[in-house]
């Protein structure tokens, strides 16, 4: 039987559902609405395997903050009622047949990326449910990203229209432009238009930096900030080699599974 693994970026989904509520303290409503959302996702995607991946909620900002100390500094914490309700949300999802994977020190993004790539590399179909465009660097013939809330696929045509680069160049793109929401600065003075121009001429940051053909208007910026660009690229790239400690069979989904 053909495999279709659906990976839910859990907090990405929960936060969006919760933020649309008139009463942020009504976690019972959050549970109900996320269950409805997941039921629609299951109905539309027909998974054979499914899992929800949650970020760890400790104070440790992980390996990216070691490379770039300002990474995700100053982000608003999760609302306390929602934080206190996460276990109930996970229980409600478990009753639907969806297990939760909680990261321990790693960001959920890296766990999602590792699991998705391991399965896709064997030629099996993987769908990541998330609005996070960072996952687009993983795109492959059997790995796709679905923005459920905008009802769109974050596919290669979307990336070309949105950023003007190839999926495999996205970490270089963000190494140049930065990611403001994560406090990733990039090279000062290089924005999306310049990054698109550079990456249409060169494969990546290193090739551009080493080339005598790099336009003069960018040479000084590269010479002054190349190490920063390298660090920003590293934190923008997703890890795909985390030890998972379980196998795909553990994630098998059965519709209307009795729990």
Curated annotation (Swiss-Prot):
EC number: 3.1.-.-
Coiled coil start-end: none
Region (Interaction with DNA) location: 189-194
GO MF annotation terms: 5'-3' exonuclease activity; 5'-flap endonuclease activity; DNA binding; magnesium ion binding; potassium ion binding
Any GO BP: DNA replication, Okazaki fragment processing
Cofactor note: Binds 2 Mg(2+) per subunit. Only one magnesium ion has a direct interaction with the protein, the other interactions are indirect. Binds 1 K(+) per subunit. The potassium ion strongly increases the affinity for DNA.
Role description: Has flap endonuclease activity. During DNA replication, flap endonucleases cleave the 5'-overhanging flap structure that is generated by displacement synthesis when DNA polymerase encounters the 5'-end of a downstream Okazaki fragment.
HAMAP family in the cross-refs: Xni (MF_01192)
Protein name: Flap endonuclease Xni
Protein encoded by which gene: xni
